[in-house]
């Protein structure tokens, strides 16, 4: 189980990313337009002035049961360890154990 503080920090990052999403997207569109270099630098400074944690690259997917940040399956939102346990317990419909 991940520490509560790490999970809380990740939730704060997600909220901050949602808050600044439109600002970041519009700034990036403006930078991609053909503008004088001085204008691009101004827009770039505006983009850099936003908080670091508002960047989507700083988010991690976490298992919603354990909070584990690694080995996550997007389709289920679970870590590999928990996914395997749930498949063995027949809690995930349609998932088949591999056997050979």
From Swiss-Prot:
One of its GO terms (molecular function) is structural constituent of ribosome. Disulfide bonds: none annotated. GO terms for cellular component: chloroplast; small ribosomal subunit. Keywords: Chloroplast, Plastid, Ribonucleoprotein, Ribosomal protein, RNA-binding, rRNA-binding. Part of the 30S ribosomal subunit. Binds 16S rRNA, required for the assembly of 30S particles. This is Small ribosomal subunit protein uS14c. It comes from Dioscorea elephantipes.
